[in-house]
């Protein structure tokens, strides 16, 4: 049996992520075979159970509500293109290229089938080959695999310049723009995922096998968590690379903390998320708990804030998700206009990228990560996306370089993987 056939969903937590606790020990949640699955293109939903498929016309988030009410745990994603059904007045008007993935896609499990434990127990149980440590990874500038971006450097820089022009005109304050890359993948997707996680452990790593493709994510960003009547979001805006020495690393981190540009960018998204939460929360309950804190990962430092609010405990999951989707940190501000600008400037479909990935429980609690650092795998093929927030004083060349920085964990893991081929 291939390792990817043992579990259909695995959520890895380096600390205070999926498991929402303060444990420093990396942990996991995993599920074997789903009892039911459903996916949608727009509001045409396909439900599969016991080998039988049914197509119905309905809001997929209402289908999610229904199955949670029946006692299932749901693991999956809400894709970026579903924004057309959550953002009033927005409709895509440009043809896009690239693979079309379902807009909403969930696997449904009996809660009793969930297993959890420490990360080392998982890798031992899967009988994985020894995973190389980061220090043994290829660190040369030349990748050991052929990477195919969907835009040339010139095209990417021009896209950023056009985004800046909208900012200078006063249409928007910030916009997130991305590029897509495709690489060859010659090993089992789950083995690649664990190598990806080993390169850069994060709180919201996820592996979900939908059958015809696999979704892998190395996200470190909490989009939205509901725990009882409390909602929490941790928007990330502001990135810098790690230093080669401890001294340089400290200097780079200090520069990020004191950067007016990064603080302004972060604050804009904090204000956007406050507004989004306010539309579904109890009056006066929205508050900012943390502002401009820096989290450190193996390849970069990132600036993080936290917004919290209170909701009615009986509120439907679908109502909460509709009020805040898509994540503001990967769209921009104001949200509706930035969706229109992204639609105009980006040539590709985003799919699960910049959507929300996560787990929903029968009691209405859920945890959703922002769909960043994702890799979509099909036989022999890995597709991933990298992007960044553009503001009025962004340097297009530096923005391009930031996308390469953000892709390091994914490409380093591919270096290992394709060496094994």
Residue ranges and their predicted role:
Residues 1-421:
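Extended alpha-helical targeting/anchoring segments
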């Amino acid at each position: 049996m291939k390792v990817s056939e043992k579990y259909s969903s695995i959520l890895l937590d380096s600390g205070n992520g999926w498991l929402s606790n303060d444990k420093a020990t990396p942990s996991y949640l995993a599920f074997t075979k789903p009892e039911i699955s459903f996916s949608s293109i727009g509001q045409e939903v396909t439900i599969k159970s016991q080998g039988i498929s049914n197509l119905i016309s309905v809001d997929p988030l209402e289908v999610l509500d229904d199955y949670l009410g029946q006692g299932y745990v749901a693991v999956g994603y809400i894709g970026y293109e579903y924004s057309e059904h959550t953002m009033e007045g927005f409709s895509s008007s440009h043809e896009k290229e690239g693979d079309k993935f379902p807009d909403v896609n969930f696997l449904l499990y009996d809660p009793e089938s969930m297993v959890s434990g420490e990360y080392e127990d998982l890798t031992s149980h899967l009988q994985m080959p020894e995973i190389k440590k980061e220090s043994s990874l290829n660190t040369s500038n030349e990748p050991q695999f052929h990477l195919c971006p969907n835009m040339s450097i010139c095209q990417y820089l021009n896209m950023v310049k056009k985004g800046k022009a909208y900012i200078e005109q006063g249409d928007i304050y910030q916009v997130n723009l991305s590029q897509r890359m495709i690489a060859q993948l010659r090993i089992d997707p789950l083995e690649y995922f664990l190598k990806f996680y080993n390169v850069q452990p994060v709180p919201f790593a996820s592996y979900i096998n939908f059958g015809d493709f696999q979704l892998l994510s190395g996200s470190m960003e909490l989009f939205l968590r509901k725990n009882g009547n409390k909602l929490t979001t941790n928007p990330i805006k502001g990135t810098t690379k790690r230093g080669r020495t401890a001294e340089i690393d400290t200097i780079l981190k200090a520069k990020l903390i004191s950067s007016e540009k990064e603080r302004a960018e972060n604050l804009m998204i904090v204000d956007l998320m406050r507004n989004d939460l306010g539309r579904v929360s109890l009056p006066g309950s929205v508050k900012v708990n943390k502002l401009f804190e820096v989290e450190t990962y193996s390849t970069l430092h990132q600036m993080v804030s936290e917004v919290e609010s209170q909701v009615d405990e009986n509120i439907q999951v679908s109502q909460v998700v509709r009020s805040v989707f898509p994540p503001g940190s990967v769209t921009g501000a104001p949200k509706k206009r930035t969706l229109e600008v992204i639609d105009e400037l980006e040539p590709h479909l985003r799919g699960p990228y910049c959507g929300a990935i996560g787990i929903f429980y029968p009691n209405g609690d859920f945890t959703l990560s922002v769909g960043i650092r994702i890799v979509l795998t099909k036989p022999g093929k890995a597709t991933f996306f990298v992007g960044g927030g553009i503001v009025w004083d962004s340097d297009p060349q530096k923005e391009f370089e930031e996308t390469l920085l953000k892709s390091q964990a994914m490409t380093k893991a591919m270096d290992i993987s394709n060496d094994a081929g």
